[in-house]
Amino acid sequence: MKKLFVSVVALLAAVSLSAQDVTAIYNEAAAAFGAKDFAGAAAKFEQVIEQGLDSEEAASLVATAKTTLPKCYFMMGGGAIRTKNYDEALKNFTKSAELAELYGDMSQMAKANGWVAKIYQIQGGDAFNNKDYATAAGVFEKGYKADPDNTAMALNLAMS
């Protein structure tokens, strides 16, 4: 009986310590997000999700991390697009859309997919202007798949 009691106390202490660890990581993630270190914040929010998934005490932190993680990748995509690093922007916006869909944030998914389509429109336009119509058509097709409501993309696809 004494061993059982000691085991239960040890287990409860481990769960409590784990929840404290998740809280500390969450606070680091929030600080990084506030400092606009979106890559650092994304890594920490991923840790919060992984480590807090089985903890009832950390459920609200995990829920917030799941909401904020796609936004981190969205912001990294925005930073990459400002420097015209379209490949990096495309990677981050795509990751944002995938995570938003996974965690049920359809509004964030639509915003990220809208930017994916815009990047494909830029890349397709460059190929089209260089008279590389086959490449342009392939790129416009990817953009149209990302944002099927984009009528300009559909028109570009039809013209190429």
Protein language model features and the residues they cover:
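Position-specific recognition of the canonical hydrophobic site in helix A of tetratricopeptide repeat
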Residues: 33, 81, 121, 128-129
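Canonical tetratricopeptide repeat
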Residues: 61-68, 75, 108, 115, ...
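Short coil turns that delineate tetratricopeptide repeat
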Residues: 53, 101, 148-149
